[in-house]
Amino acid sequence: MCIRDRYSPASINFCPYERRYFTERNAGKIDAVRNQISLWHEGGLIGPSENCLLVADLLEAASGIANIAGTYGCFLKKWTQQSQGELAIKERDLMPQCVVHKMSVGDVFDIKVEQHDVVYLDPPYTKRQYASYYHIPETIAYHDEPSVEGVAGLRPWKHNASPFCYKSKALQAIYDCVNGLSADRIYLSYSSQGHVELSELVNCLAGLGGVRLHSLGEIGRYRPNRVAASKEAVVEEYLIEVDKAPGD
């Protein structure tokens, strides 16, 4: 009962905090579904692909009834209308034919690419650490029972902290990432909301090859609360093209 006991009002029975990420009913359903998927997988009734598919469907369904403002950094004090709905797992539309592709999960600094590959990078722009902002989906996916702490009930995450999210480390991290990739052509997505000034970033990457800056225009700024809503309403999105091929 990991989700129910940690992330619903039932948490008050186990810690000083009444967490409201999910209603007790929905949290119990999440636990039940996740346990059943695990039993099917361990019993050989489904394979690794089916296991991943069903867990992904559960994560999507859980997000649909979570009492949050976009991420799981913390729960909302008052219940939203969305959170009062019932957990519902929808059938996913699958492609009728197999598509040959390859995916990997790991540290971007460890990714191996070929010179002829084209790489697209979309690093975090701000201080928001994904490891902490999405801790509950991590717990559902791993199906473990970590020790959690604080009002938000965070699982241990600092070992997964991203250097891109620290203002003092972001520029060097981006440079090291681009420099370490063997691909000749690299595209980097960045924002005016980011830690690094755009001109500073472009000048830094210019030492690796030809750099072209493409403006993608303005988008609405994410505003989860009144404080954020009072700030600048839009941000500029950019695509930085780095061509490392000799002579280009």
Regions found by a protein language model. Give the residues of each.
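Class I S-adenosyl-L-methionine
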Residues: L198-C204, L208-G247
